[in-house]
C-alpha cells in the first residue's frame, strides 16, 4: 500500500514538472509573438 502512494506521488511530481516546463515555453512564445506584433504595428503605422 505504501508503495502505491509513493508511486502516485512521484508520477504527479513528474506531471507538475512537465507542466511547468511547458508553461514556461508557452510564456516565452507569447512574449516573442507580442514583440513581433508590436514591431509590425510600429512599421505599418510609421509608414508615411
Curated annotation (Swiss-Prot):
Signal peptide: none annotated. The keyword Cell membrane applies. Residues 17-48 are annotated as: Required for DVL/RTFL small polypeptide activity. The chain crosses the membrane at residues 4-23. GO terms for biological process: negative regulation of cell population proliferation; shoot system development. It is a single-pass membrane protein. Small polypeptide acting as a regulatory molecule which coordinates cellular responses required for differentiation, growth and development, probably by restricting polar cell proliferation in lateral organs and coordinating socket cell recruitment and differentiation at trichome sites. Belongs to the DVL/RTFL small polypeptides family. This is Small polypeptide DEVIL 14. It comes from Arabidopsis thaliana. The lineage of its organism: Eukaryota, Viridiplantae, Streptophyta, Embryophyta, Tracheophyta. The gene is DVL14.
